[in-house]
Swiss-Prot record:
Phylogenetic lineage: Bacteria, Pseudomonadati, Pseudomonadota, Gammaproteobacteria, Alteromonadales
Family note: Belongs to the CinA family.
NCBIfam families from the UniProt entry: cinA_nterm, PncC_domain
PANTHER family membership: NICOTINAMIDE-NUCLEOTIDE AMIDOHYDROLASE PNCC, NMN AMIDOHYDROLASE-LIKE PROTEIN YFAY
SMART domains to which the protein is assigned, alphabetical: MoCF_biosynth
InterPro entries: CinA, CinA-like_C, CinA_C, Competence-induced_CinA, MoaB/Mog-like_dom_sf, MoaB/Mog_dom
Name of the protein in question: CinA-like protein
Domain of life: Bacteria
One protein family per Pfam: MoCF_biosynth
Protein species of origin: Shewanella sediminis (strain HAW-EB3)
Coiled coil feature spans: none
SUPFAM superfamilies according to UniProt: CinA-like (SSF142433), Molybdenum cofactor biosynthesis proteins (SSF53218)
């Protein structure tokens, strides 16, 4: 089966918005063992849409068309498909009824232009949109099924999960088994990872890919066919042996997600005191529903005065060692934990740059501490040559990983090999 995607819209083509739908779609389908082999972006020009629908329908088996189903004059996907098929547009009585009910239910007056959304190419199969006004539909042209969906992300994603994937599984025999394993690494670049893992011989049916979203690189092991799936545990073990502590999580997207889930399940609590990370540790956790069950407080104590008055850091410690020091960050973590009696507390203090560094403590020097009931773990990491944003993101990730390792009963301070450090 050959799957392609056509994305529509001048704003996407011009780069005015980032097409997150396409990335999500390809990643979601890959998890089902369905590879998207081509993606095309087309602007809001009727003749271009007609041409690309005709052309790709002779090459692909199924085509996801995203966007252009709205009520405005530049929403042209439905009209273009009808022209490509050589059929008229006809009103779907079923969708018009649903459309009118949607506006009534939401206490809104339906504009006459919205009736355009009930028009479908003659012979089209209506695809329900349970959360919006744009009617999805599927048509057969030449060798391809074309599946039309709205560009609104939450509408699109729901229709893919509830309508498109079952449609594909019904229309095409997807009998071959697939398995995907994802490993999250911290601090390394793609080229470095590729060089290190080049020693691993991949059996037939197993592929290894990388996805960068710094500070993380995700390694994806994809196996197609039972023989390849059976070999996956051995390949995974080889990857882990090569990368060691560089692997910080499995089958999740970010460390904050793992920390959130582990704290939820453990019933343990956390406080956070941040300087150079400026709330990033706290913000990452608050993004997940239910974080109030474990997150006691998130304090941004940027100034020395705040460190002293809010966290109880000894002013003599600041005078003797400076704000960016293991001694200071340990007192920050201890103070944050003590305010509300949290089980754990994380603290950071560093020089994110681009200015403020010294010979002894250059830009990229960050102190991180984890306070527990039994003691304090701390380390100073050196992140030279990174942007301010990346220094802060890496520092946040290292703090998360220290807590993750503590929750798992592992060594809290480890060598990531991708940046230098020293600890107390």
């Amino acid at each position: 089966m050959k799957l392609e995607m056509i994305c529509t819209g001048e704003e996407v083509l011009a780069g005015q918005i980032v097409d997150t739908n396409a990335a999500w779609f390809a990643n979601t389908l890959m998890g089902k063992g369905i590879e998207c082999q081509r993606r095309i972006t087309v602007g809001d020009r009727l003749e271009d849409l007609v041409a690309v629908f005709k052309e790709r329908s002779t090459e692909a088996d199924i085509i996801m068309v995203n966007g252009g189903l709205g009520p405005t004059s530049d929403d042209l996907s439905t009209e273009a498909m009808a022209l490509a098929m050589g059929v008229p547009l006809v009103e779907s009585k079923e969708w018009r009824t649903k459309l009118e009910a949607w506006f009534t239910r939401n206490n809104r007056v339906m504009a006459a232009s919205n009736l355009k959304q009930a028009l479908l190419p003659e012979g089209a199969v209506m695809i329900d949109n349970p959360v919006g006004t744009a009617c999805g539909f599927a048509v057969k042209l030449n060798r391809a099924w074309l599946f039309f969906t709205p560009g609104v992300p939450f509408e699109f994603k729901r229709m893919v999960k509830e309508q498109f994937i079952p449609f594909v599984e019904k229309q095409f025999a997807l009998s071959e088994s697939v398995s995907v394993k994802k490993l999250l690494t911290l601090g390394r670049g793609e080229s470095s990872l590729a060089d290190e893992l080049d020693v691993i011989q991949l059996p037939e049916g197993v592929t290894l890919g990388y996805r960068s979203y710094m500070p993380y690189i995700e390694i994806k092991l994809f196996a197609r066919g039972q023989s390849a799936i059976d070999s996956l545990p051995d390949i995974e073990a080889q990857v882990k042996k090569v990368l060691g502590n560089g692997i910080v999580a499995e089958n999740i997207t970010t460390l904050d997600q793992e920390i959130h889930e582990r704290l939820i399940n453990s019933g343990l609590s956390l406080s956070v005191a941040e300087s150079c990370t400026g709330g990033m540790i706290t913000s990452g956790l608050v993004a997940f529903a239910g974080s109030s069950s474990y997150l006691h407080q998130g304090l941004v104590t940027y100034s020395n005065e705040a460190k002293v008055k809010v966290l109880g850091v000894n002013s003599q410690t600041l005078d003797d060692y400076g704000a960016v020091s293991i001694a200071t960050v340990e007192e920050m973590a201890k103070g944050a934990r003590g305010i509300l009696g949290s089980d754990y507390a994380l603290a950071t203090s560093g020089i994110a740059g681009p200015e403020g560094g010294t010979d002894e403590k250059p830009v990229g020097t960050v102190a991180i501490a984890l306070a527990t009931k039994s003691g304090i773990y701390s380390q100073m990491v050196k992140l030279p040559g990174r942007s301010r944003a990346l220094v802060r993101a890496l520092s946040t990730a290292v703090a998360y990983d220290m807590l993750r390792r503590e929750l798992l009963g592992e060594a809290v301070i480890v060598d990531y090999s991708s940046f230098s450090r020293f600890c107390k």
